[in-house]
């Protein structure tokens, strides 16, 4: 199926992928590539328009230059922050360090233009935006006009109406820019003329065809974790190749309470997929003994998964592929996306824990989808809502929710505490009757391998501490800690301390992302 496409060239901003998400929300297909994508590949991609992302560097650094031939393709170009500076610099304007950095909220006064017409916030011809820049455009290129300014940035927006080139010094992709989505939609839909044909039914059709082409008659093994991503991946691959897919559900001793039974029942009842249940708790615990470094734990868990899959592969004579539920944020955090300049934060279990000598080829049908798109895909594939809207669970399971060394004792305590937390979130509603489980995007307990003094009855206790974590996010790229009611937190704390022998203190994590990540390890 032929569809209109937008190309995003990434200069290294940590929020570039939000641009892709906003474009897809307009039902237009887009791809994100490194800023140095060769011009012949750009031409072959045949985009309706190009978006140049922000980035942390200066236009005067030679290592961060895109092919300026993009300005000769006869298609609209939108430069965001660094992208605007790159456009101005290479088209004859001037860029210089600002007298003061602009970071955070700003109000832009706009002039009527093809990009801004009819788009404003509370006051006429004003936009509430999010800035993050030091350098700024100090002189316009020929053919450009100013269409927006702030007191400290006289050229905050610029336009070449004839060539349909636009530059904006702020970030429309972040939610802090109130009309950011409207501006991006104006560029993508109206200026570029892209037709909104990218929908989940269309995506399923294309993904199924691609999987069939990749796999052929080979057999595929997929590891089920019980989480949303692997479940949706299994449904999509099963739609494409049916019984060529065998799912391997590995019980590594790091699952949530009663999860093994739930996963087996759910897949047998709802999907009809072949599932092999492997009890490997002893194998995983032995390998993790004495290991405290989170990166080493992740890689050990990844390596042990591969060992398990290798053992199962020998039983499947035609197995050639290992399928995973890797999604876009996983790839981004590991700096493994199609761009070269992302900054590595931590290795993800789906992309950073694979041994170099892995015998199976990798199949990752969800790697270009954001979490909300994965859920939408799951619903379109007919999966039950309770499965699709379950909170994310990491592949290493409780292994990255137990700080430091992983022990069976710790896992058993954490399982119980986590289950109590989730129960209370499901059973407690806000004033509109919505459960706090549905109001939060991800919630879980974390085991801290430290003991604190407590008093229970007439006796002194010296037991472990559990931290509760709950966040609200639309894309898992950034997140706010959930402001849960004190009464809810109090009930959770009381139940954990009274029902889980070995825990005598419960704390609540109030860190956002950034600066913290959602998972503790």
From Swiss-Prot:
Residues in the signal sequence: none
Pathway recorded for this protein: Purine metabolism; GMP biosynthesis; GMP from XMP (L-Gln route): step 1/1
Xref: SUPFAM superfamilies: Adenine nucleotide alpha hydrolases-like, Class I glutamine amidotransferase-like, GMP synthetase C-terminal dimerisation domain
Active site: 81, 171, 173
Reactions listed under catalytic activity: XMP + L-glutamine + ATP + H2O = GMP + L-glutamate + AMP + diphosphate + 2 H(+)
Keywords: ATP-binding, Glutamine amidotransferase, GMP biosynthesis, Ligase, Nucleotide-binding, Purine biosynthesis
Residue ranges constituting the GMPS ATP-PPase domain according to the UniProt record: 198-390
UniProt-listed InterPro entries: Class_I_gatase-like, GATASE, GMP_synth_C, GMP_synth_GATase, GMP_synthase, GMPS_ATP_PPase_dom, NAD/GMP_synthase, Rossmann-like_a/b/a_fold
One function term, GO molecular function aspect: ATP binding
Residues engaged in binding ATP: 225-231
One cellular component (GO) term of this entry: cytosol
EC number of this enzyme: 6.3.5.2
PROSITE patterns referenced in this protein's UniProt entry, alphabetically: GATASE_TYPE_1, GMPS_ATP_PPASE
Domain Glutamine amidotransferase type-1: 5-197
Coiled-coil region: none
NCBIfam families from the UniProt entry: guaA_Cterm, guaA_Nterm, PRK00074.1
Subunit and interaction comment: Homodimer.
Role noted for this protein: Catalyzes the synthesis of GMP from XMP.
HAMAP family on file: GMP_synthase
This protein's name: GMP synthase [glutamine-hydrolyzing]
Protein species of origin: Neisseria gonorrhoeae (strain ATCC 700825 / FA 1090)
């Amino acid at each position: 199926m032929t569809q209109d496409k937008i190309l995003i060239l990434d200069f290294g901003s940590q929020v570039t992928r939000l641009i892709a998400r906003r474009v897809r929300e307009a039902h237009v297909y887009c791809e994100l590539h490194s800023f140095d994508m060769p011009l012949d590949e750009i031409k072959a991609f045949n985009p309706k328009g190009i978006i140049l992302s922000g980035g942390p560097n200066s236009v005067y650094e030679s290592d961060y230059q895109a092919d300026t031939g993009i300005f000769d393709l006869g298609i609209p170009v939108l430069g965001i922050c660094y992208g605007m500076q790159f456009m101005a610099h290479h088209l004859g304007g001037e860029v210089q360090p600002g007298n003061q950095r602009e970071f955070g909220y700003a109000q832009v006064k706009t002039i009527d233009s093809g990009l801004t017409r009819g788009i404003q916030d509370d006051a006429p011809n004003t936009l509430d935006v999010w800035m993050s820049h030091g350098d700024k455009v100090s002189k316009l290129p020929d053919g450009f006009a100013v269409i927006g300014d702030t007191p400290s940035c006289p050229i905050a927006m610029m336009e070449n109406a004839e060539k349909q080139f636009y530059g904006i010094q702020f970030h429309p992709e972040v939610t802090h820019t109130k009309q950011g989505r409207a501006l991006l939609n104006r560029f993508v839909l109206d200026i570029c003329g892209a037709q909104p044909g990218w929908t989940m039914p269309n995506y399923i059709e294309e993904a199924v065809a691609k999987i069939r082409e990749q796999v052929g008659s080979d057999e595929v093994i997929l590891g089920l974790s019980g989480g949303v991503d692997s479940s949706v991946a299994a449904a999509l691959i099963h739609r494409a190749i049916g019984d060529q897919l065998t799912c391997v559900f590995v019980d590594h001793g790091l699952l949530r309470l009663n999860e093994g039974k739930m996963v087996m029942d759910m897949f047998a009842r709802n999907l009809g997929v072949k599932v092999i249940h492997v009890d490997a708790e002893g194998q995983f615990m032995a390998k993790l003994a004495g290991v405290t470094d989170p990166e080493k734990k992740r890689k050990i868990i990844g390596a042990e998964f591969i060992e398990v899959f290798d053992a199962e592969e020998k039983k499947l004579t035609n197995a050639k592929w290992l399928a995973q539920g890797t999604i876009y944020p996983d790839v981004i955090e590991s700096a493994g996306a199609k761009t070269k300049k992302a900054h590595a934060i931590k290795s993800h279990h789906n992309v950073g824990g694979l041994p170099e000598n892995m015998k199976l080829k990798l199949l990752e049908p969800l790697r270009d989808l954001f979490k909300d798109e994965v859920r939408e895909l799951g619903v379109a594939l007919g999966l039950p809502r309770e499965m699709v809207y379950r909170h994310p669970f990491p592949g290493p399971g409780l292994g990255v929710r137990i700080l430091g060394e992983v022990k069976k004792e710790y896992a058993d305590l954490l399982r119980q505490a986590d289950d109590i937390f989730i129960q209370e979130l499901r059973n407690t509603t806000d004033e509109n009757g919505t459960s706090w489980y549905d109001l939060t995007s991800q919630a879980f307990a974390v085991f801290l391998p430290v003991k604190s003094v407590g008093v229970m009855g007439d006796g002194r206790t010296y037991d472990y501490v559990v931290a509760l974590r709950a966040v609200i996010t639309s894309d898992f790229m950034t997140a706010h800690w959930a402001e849960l009611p004190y009464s809810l937190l109090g009930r959770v704390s009381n139940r954990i301390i009274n029902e889980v022998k070995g825990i005598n203190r419960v704390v609540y994590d109030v860190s956002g992302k950034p600066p913290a990540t959602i998972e503790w390890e």
